[in-house]
Amino acid sequence: MKFYFPVHLDGGNRGCEAIAKSTAILLNQPKENIIGLCTDIPTDNKLGLNQCVTLRHVELPLYQRVINRLSRYLHLDSLRRSIYDYFLKPMKKEDIMISTGGDMMCYGNNFVIETNDIATRKGCKTVLWGCSMAASNLTPEKEKTLRKFDI
């Protein structure tokens, strides 16, 4: 079983970094079993996150970036893919996705919904961990995704 942290992103946000790092320590698993999406590996290495999390940087292949631009222009959203699709692709049913990060639900409908949808489609367990949100920012889409989380 592996644990995926798709919304940590990088240590530039110290709250997200602290939640990801402390969660990894609490899981008490080899770092190879804890995979974190990262946009700034040097910063996370400097902060020591690489000691307890396997950091993975994901970039969309050129062909997918072209398809994404065309799909936006032609309004064909079903063809669009994100870094989250590629990051979560290796997930197996026995794996767990942990959405870490303080204020990630305080902004419009975002990647938390997308990552939860991807993991749920794969039959994986999902955990919402260390998150705040304001009632004024609660949308129907967020309510739906909150109900999908297993924990």
Question: What do the predicted segments below correspond to?
Answer:
Residues D150-I151:
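A short beta-strand/loop micro-motif in the catalytic core of glycosyltransferases
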Residues M1-N137, E141, T145:
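Aromatic- and Gly/Pro-rich donor/ligand-binding loops
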